[in-house]
Amino acid sequence: MSGNAYVTASPESEPAFIDEGRCAIRNWDDQETVVSFYFRAMNKGKMTVSLQAIGHSQVEVSLLGETEEVELASDTLTLVEVGTFKVKEPGYVKVDIRGKKINAGDSFGNVESLVVKGNVGPVVCVNGDFSTHFGRRGPSTHMSYTLPEGDVEWFYNEVVVPEEGDIPSSYYMACGFGEGYFGMQNNTPYPRRILFSVWSPFVTDNPAEIPDSMRVQLVRKGEQTTINDFGNEGSGGQSYMHYDWKPGERCRFLMGVRPDKNNTTVYTAYFYDNHQNKWSLVASWRRPQITTWYTHAYSFLENFNPVMGHITRKAYYCNQWARTADGKWLPVTQGRFTCDATGNQKQRLDYKGGVENNDFFLTMGGFFNDFLESGTPFTREGNVTEAPDVDFSTLE
């Protein structure tokens, strides 16, 4: 349960939640609460579904258009059969469990595992030693871009999030580079952000451990920008500004990488403020122990909240351009779709990318069926003749 189930409905006053560490449903005492298990049946056929559960209650189990009532009547974990079901087509199966009546105690009990037997396998789910935290978040998806030959200083990208893809706890990263990333987040219930981060060359998840000589140093920042350290996924310098971007809005990003003196490199990020019709400086950082131009251009889409991995996210990445060190704009039209370890290790198969209406797109999460193999290349066509209209002399 800890890696494959979500509370998909619950009263707002005292919502139930899944305790990953203890593999338990907490606050499960309201009939409004629905706990949903997800797994992928790779073949059609018949399967018997059972609950490994504890408690004294009646619960309702729904899947594949059928509903069965099951009685839990044990103080220890017991295997309780739900029924036999026909899987007509390979794909994800959602199993909803709802409490109907508490017979003893103060909750419906706990369902620790869902047991599936039959000829529909192999069954794809988060299992073994794989992280339940990252498994429940879902597979992050990436689009890596082919930069032109020679020294590239600037990478330009546009992001459009459709209404159906605008989900809380999402990072729509636009301009990744070899040493960091730059994009926008839906941080609901907090204000939406434009986020720009640069990793330190010192490898640690604790920024306090970074020696002074290996710290990323702030060069300058925008007036509305907040500066922090960051950790947990590498460490370094973080900068962000609040911007109330909307679904359907075309958000423009400009990211620069330029080698500097004394074996350092300066990274500078600008975001186009559609409300004020101007480019706004997010920040400029200096990273030690490296001399480089722009490398490894890519975008990604991720969910950073494990309780929301059952909801699909989507974003379009549009009109990519690279500007060489000698000032020439060149279109970027080739991309390669990949995903993270959650997808590569086949813990989940709800990831996809590609080209729609001559724009790259990424989608992930929500247990959809038409996944795409990691490593698939794509080429966009569309307008590759009009370079971005950026007056660099006016940038902060």
Language-model-detected regions and their locations in the chain:
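Extracytoplasmic
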Residues: 1-244, 252-259, 263-396
